[in-house]
From Swiss-Prot:
Keywords: Cell membrane, Developmental protein, Growth regulation, Membrane. Pfam families: Auxin_inducible. GO terms for cellular component: plasma membrane. Provide a mechanistic link between auxin and plasma membrane H(+)-ATPases (PM H(+)-ATPases, e.g. AHA1 and AHA2), and triggers PM H(+)-ATPases activity by promoting phosphorylation of their C-terminal autoinhibitory domain as a result of PP2C-D subfamily of type 2C phosphatases inhibition, thus leading to the acidification of the apoplast and the facilitation of solutes and water uptake to drive cell expansion. Triggers plant growth probably by promoting cell elongation. Regulates branch angles and bending. It is found in: Cell membrane. Belongs to the ARG7 family. It comes from Arabidopsis thaliana (Mouse-ear cress). This is Protein SMALL AUXIN UP-REGULATED RNA 16.
Length: 105
């Protein structure tokens, strides 16, 4: 599955939605005065991966990688961007996610 250039506008809108959603995650965390989670460094966002929904903090630069965009498309197809978990859930096994992110880094 390849990311099409013609869908650049759609991808941009999707990325903005993801970042907006991720900046206002869950009510269980401590937030700064701007409403951002204290445990997420600037330029990063949390994702939940695998059956146990393990939380990972990833840099926003991942949003420019075609392989990561494929995971985001799968997440949208499976969960949409509004679901009970409150954050962005990636529908793959942790081992696959860790392998992919280590290649991107």
């Amino acid at each position: 599955m390849a990311v099409k250039r013609s869908s650049k506008l759609t991808q941009t809108a999707m990325l903005k939605q993801i970042l907006k959603r991720c900046s206002s995650l869950g009510k269980k965390q401590c937030y700064d005065e701007e409403g951002l989670p204290l445990d997420v460094p600037k330029g990063h966002f949390p994702v939940y991966v695998g059956e146990k929904r393990t939380r990972y903090i990833v840099p926003i630069s991942f949003l420019t990688h075609p392989e990561f965009l494929i995971l985001l498309q799968q997440a949208e197809e499976e969960f949409g961007f509004r679901h009970d978990m409150g954050g962005l859930t990636i529908p793959c096994e942790e081992v696959v996610f860790l392998s992919l992110t280590s290649m991107i880094r």
